[in-house]
């Protein structure tokens, strides 16, 4: 990969965007950003609190602004929030400003990876987690697919293996 281009990771919660993103950035000697962590850094509060106080709409506005600013940088790896693709503006910016990698995973794997995580506001509801994740998948998977340059399934693979697969695919293109 001669020139440094941006790599944007999209996919559902629990797909491994943050873990794989850190690994990928380290291997490629690029800066890593996580849009949720950036929102937390800027607000001084965790994502769940922002969701509670501002609602999903307020959170998505912050997310859109953060992603817009981060995607203007060069040579970064960005792990986006699972719902960031709901914004057409964000989808357009991700597509225009870098390579979009869709990290795909099964509902079963999402459940296993997120079951004890209290920092997932969309799972802090009365409905069963499986039902919530299935509804989110039905809504968002077509949006991930719409903007993906590359799709990789992360089930049963380490972050390093997935990062290597991404690097291989990028070197071919």
Swiss-Prot record:
It is found in: Cytoplasm. GO terms for cellular component: cytosol. Binds 1 Mg(2+) ion per subunit. Its EC number is 2.7.1.71. Pfam families: SKI. Monomer. This is Shikimate kinase 1. It comes from Photorhabdus laumondii subsp. laumondii (strain DSM 15139 / CIP 105565 / TT01) (Photorhabdus luminescens subsp. laumondii). The lineage of its organism: Bacteria, Pseudomonadati, Pseudomonadota, Gammaproteobacteria, Enterobacterales.
